[in-house]
Amino acid sequence: MARDYPKEFEPIVAKAKSLGKPMRVAVAAANSENILRGVFAAEDDGFVKPILVGNEDKIRAVVNTIGEGGRELDIHGVFGGDNPVQYAIEMINSGDADTLMRGNCQTRDYLLPVLNKANHLIEDDALVTHVVFLKVPGYEKVLAISDVTLLINPDLAERKQVLLNMVDAMKILDIEHPNIALLTMVEKPCFHMRDTVEAQTLVAKHKKYPIADCNIAGPISYDLIMSKEAARLKEYDCPYCGEFDGIVVPNLMAGNLLVKVLMNNAGAVGFGLLTGAKIPIAISGRSDAPEQTYLSLAACAAKLVK
């Protein structure tokens, strides 16, 4: 696989490669072509040791299909009604793996075992969120967006935790004091739009008692987030317009659609990871390019670097 990704992500890969030893990744339902291409590229670059979990015959068939039949494989066969995601999690809990990667399984089937507190990947009071990092053409900075998979309609407390998780995740890019936007449809509080009122409340709380080491603005619409000129024309007084590092979205539909539109129609390139668990967890779609899997794994490895 060609290492074809924006130069802005190079610090993440460099940090991943500085990990003292390869990160042991349990790939659940590993019979996925593009997932394995990304996993094997990370292995070749020295920061991943893959453990392939699932139906062995299907895994070997995919490995042969992508031209990797000569590669030494560590396969853990799972048969019948056994859940490969659950098996992979048990490997982590037993100390035989460091993190988890989604393979050829539905998002729901991957996330439910991860979120199950009985599986010990999450502290009792923790909230797991999905952060996506994008390089959008025409926008100078890497842009983090969350939450895009887990929280259907987050309340004020949950949006605060989304923000905290995002700020923590941004450290893989050495961003220590990011500018965070609380996305809403309009830039003024409106009683009929709960998210605008909560954004105003969150900003007010942050000004009085800082929530995290970051700057926060909101409520703010997407055009103002991305453009200083739009802010000037609409007389929106915020020094961070056009220079935001992250966007906290109001709900799952807004976040998921925003990411998909930017990636499918605007040429954005990026990756995601799950944050808020005891370990960083990789996640990539089955139709995603191998580079997205590679970068998600690099981000997890970078998080493990002390």
What would you call each of these model-derived segments?
Residues 2-240, 244-250, 254-306:
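Anion-binding alpha/beta catalytic cores of soluble intermediary-metabolism enzymes, centered on
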